[in-house]
UniProtKB/Swiss-Prot annotation:
Protein name: 6-carboxy-5,6,7,8-tetrahydropterin synthase
Function recorded in the entry: Catalyzes the conversion of 7,8-dihydroneopterin triphosphate (H2NTP) to 6-carboxy-5,6,7,8-tetrahydropterin (CPH4) and acetaldehyde.
PANTHER family with a match to the protein in the record: 6-PYRUVOYL TETRAHYDROBIOPTERIN SYNTHASE (PTHR12589:SF7), PYRUVOYL TETRAHYDROBIOPTERIN SYNTHASE (PTHR12589)
Pfam families in alphabetical order: PTPS
Pathways per UniProt: Purine metabolism; 7-cyano-7-deazaguanine biosynthesis
Keywords annotated in UniProt: Lyase, Metal-binding, Queuosine biosynthesis, Zinc
Cofactor entry: Zn(2+)
Active site: C23 (proton acceptor), H68 (charge relay system), E130 (charge relay system)
Residues annotated as binding Zn(2+): H14, H27, H29
Cofactor binding note from Swiss-Prot or TrEMBL: Binds 1 zinc ion per subunit.
Disulfide links within the chain: none
Reactions catalysed according to its record: 7,8-dihydroneopterin 3'-triphosphate + H2O = 6-carboxy-5,6,7,8-tetrahydropterin + triphosphate + acetaldehyde + 2 H(+)
InterPro entries recorded: 6-PTP_synth/QueD, 6-PTP_synth/QueD_sf
Length: 138
């Protein structure tokens, strides 16, 4: 198997409902996403995927949905609506707490498979850095 990885950076805020520490409060991160696309063999040009295609597809989705947004649990809609009404802030709701683990799993299992359809490659894994020292991999 051959993998090509593209790094995408974005800024977003979130909070973790029910967390007993400071992550229960609204705060933000400079996220770094590494998306690995894999195939069993290269195409006729000798590539798994053009790195530009990863950028065009994945980064476009990230920019439209996550970048400079507030990522919240769907149970946080009341707060999200108040923030959106007061500031115009873009809000993205998830079905579960927006932990790094859940965000990465959501992207890998629900979002990116719909974006990279009908190709001879697949999203093999994602790394999502919440800080320079802390990341999850799915």
């Amino acid at each position: 198997m051959i993998k090509c990885t593209r790094r995408i950076e974005f800024d977003a805020g979130h909070r973790i409902i029910g967390h007993q520490n400071k992550c229960q409060f609204l705060h933000g991160h400079r996220y770094v996403l590494e998306i690995a696309i894999a195939a069993n063999k290269t195409d006729k040009l000798g590539m798994v995927i053009d790195f530009g295609l990863i950028k065009d597809v994945a980064k476009k989705w990230i920019d439209e949905n996550f970048d400079h947004s507030l990522i919240l649990h769907q149970d946080d809609k009341e707060m999200g609506q108040q923030i959106e009404n007061c500031t115009g802030q873009k809000i993205y709701y998830m079905q579960n707490n927006p932990t790094a683990e859940n965000i990465a799993t959501h992207l890998k299992n629900e979002i990116f498979p719909k974006l990279f359809v009908g190709q001879n490659f697949f999203v093999s894994n994602l790394k999502l850095y919440e800080t320079p020292n802390c990341f999850v991999e799915v």
